[in-house]
Curated annotation (Swiss-Prot):
Its cofactor is heme b. It comes from the Eukaryota. The chain crosses the membrane at residues 14-30. It is found in: Plastid, Chloroplast thylakoid membrane. It comes from Gunnera chilensis (Chilean rhubarb). Heterodimer of an alpha subunit and a beta subunit. PSII is composed of 1 copy each of membrane proteins PsbA, PsbB, PsbC, PsbD, PsbE, PsbF, PsbH, PsbI, PsbJ, PsbK, PsbL, PsbM, PsbT, PsbX, PsbY, PsbZ, Psb30/Ycf12, at least 3 peripheral proteins of the oxygen-evolving complex and a large number of cofactors. It forms dimeric complexes. The gene is psbF. This b-type cytochrome is tightly associated with the reaction center of photosystem II (PSII). PSII is a light-driven water:plastoquinone oxidoreductase that uses light energy to abstract electrons from H(2)O, generating O(2) and a proton gradient subsequently used for ATP formation. It consists of a core antenna complex that captures photons, and an electron transfer chain that converts photonic excitation into a charge separation. This is Cytochrome b559 subunit beta.
Length: 39
């Protein structure tokens, strides 16, 4: 019962972290790529 109750919290936290980290990494990567192309 305890595992079933903590697992969804871990999943939501994992999805939230990746949901925020993936767009941030891609955004920073696109900015660095644009600056590199401009040079």
């Amino acid at each position: 019962m305890t595992i079933d109750r903590t697992f969804p919290i871990f999943t939501v936290r994992w999805l939230a972290v990746h949901g925020l980290a993936v767009p941030t990494v891609s955004f920073l990567g696109s900015i660095s790529a644009m600056q590199f192309i401009q040079r």
